[in-house]
């Protein structure tokens, strides 16, 4: 396994739905007399960049250099998003403003480490081809020096069929690794990429299977691998870990390494960032999946949108509690 220090040499493009994660932190002491709902006493508020921006933040935390591409609305929230990004470790980003569009915001009310409610503000219509061309031009100018491309699809309208097809072709023509966190039931949109990282429900629904059915992971994994001809497929399964499928190989399951699960918000972002960075650094699919699994186990133990860091991951690996899972680390 390549050392985590090798991540600092990586340059990775992230294209996807950028959003603002807003948290209202408080406490609940009573039920409202007006309706059977809790009354939250607001104690604190915080803002963090989410969605594709959280993928980029995880890459930066790992020491890689992310190049983030996304869109925002022509509203005050878009200005807030720019301000949050400017204060983050993401130093290279192009967030294109689109007239008449709302900046995607997810507002979460949290009390006693529990989500009380989430409020979404968004525009989900696909962007125009003209807007897509602006992004594609910027991407084409730097892609020669890039090690990998991550596509983070939250189905908020950025990744139109036009943009997706052109982006995949551009990356593959340059022989870049393309890793996708997919959305929706039609995974054929991602044909031509190297790897996708859906969760169990997404994989099952894309294969027209019941997510709760027996061996939904195995059946959907084999179906997706066959139809898309991927190099690999990593299906995340929450508290049950994740399963890696590779072309011509038996599925490889990894049990979750999480000691406590407080919040799964952004865990998929951590998985794809770590997995893609590990692949770009020269690791094989199994070692990359092991690192992604370890990173996910760390972040789900924290409340709110959070990111992995190289030091946190290194400390986790150095403890030796899971040495049997990382024999190749010292090979």
Residue ranges and their predicted role:
Residues 4-5, 33, 37-105, 316:
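Substrate-binding N-lobe of the ribokinase-like
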Residues 1-29, 328-329:
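Positively charged, low-complexity intrinsically disordered leader regions
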Residues 231-232, 257-320:
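Conserved post-catalytic alpha-helical subdomain immediately downstream of the catalytic base
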Residues 87, 94-101, 108-143:
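Conserved phosphate-binding/catalytic loop of the ribokinase/pfkB sugar-kinase fold
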Residues 145-158:
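Short acidic, glycine-rich surface-loop motifs adjacent to enzyme active sites
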Residues 18, 154, 270:
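Active-site metal-binding loops of divalent metal-dependent hydrolases
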Residues 317-331:
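A cross-kingdom feature marking charged/low-complexity
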Residues 156-251:
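Conserved phosphate/ATP/ADP-binding segment of small-molecule kinases
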């Amino acid at each position: 396994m390549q050392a985590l220090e090798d991540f600092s040499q990586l340059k990775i493009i992230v294209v996807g739905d950028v959003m603002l994660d807003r948290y209202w932190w408080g406490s609940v002491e009573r039920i409202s007399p007006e309706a059977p709902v809790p009354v939250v006493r607001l104690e604190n508020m915080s803002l963090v960049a989410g969605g594709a921006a959280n993928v980029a933040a995880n890459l930066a935390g790992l020491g890689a250099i992310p190049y983030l591409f996304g869109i925002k609305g022509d509203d005050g929230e878009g200005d807030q998003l720019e301000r949050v990004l400017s204060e983050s470790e993401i130093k290279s980003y192009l967030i294109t403003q689109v007239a008449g569009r709302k900046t995607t915001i997810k507002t979460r009310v949290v009390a006693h480490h529990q989500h009380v409610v989430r409020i979404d503000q968004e525009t989900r219509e696909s962007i125009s081809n003209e807007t897509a061309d602006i992004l594609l031009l910027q991407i084409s100018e730097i892609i020669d020096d890039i090690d990998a491309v991550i596509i983070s699809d939250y189905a908020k309208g950025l990744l139109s069929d036009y943009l997706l097809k052109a982006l995949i072709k551009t990356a593959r023509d340059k022989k870049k690794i393309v890793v996708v966190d997919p959305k929706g039931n039609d995974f054929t949109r991602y044909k031509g990429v190297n790897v996708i990282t859906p969760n169990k429900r997404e994989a099952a629904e894309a294969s027209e299977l019941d997510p709760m059915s027996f061996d939904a992971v195995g059946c959907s994994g084999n179906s997706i691998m066959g139809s898309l001809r991927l190099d690999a497929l990593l299906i995340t399964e929450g508290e049950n870990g994740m399963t890696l499928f590779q072309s011509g190989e038996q599925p490889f399951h990894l049990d979750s390494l999480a000691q406590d699960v407080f919040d799964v918000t952004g865990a998929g972002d951590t998985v794809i960032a770590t997995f893609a960075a590990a692949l770009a650094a020269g690791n094989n699919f199994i070692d990359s999946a092991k690192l992604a699994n370890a990173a996910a186990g760390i972040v789900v133990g924290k409340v709110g949108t959070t990111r992995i860091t190289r030091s946190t991951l290194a400390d986790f690996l150095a403890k030796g509690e899971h040495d049997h899972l990382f024999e190749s680390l010292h090979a």
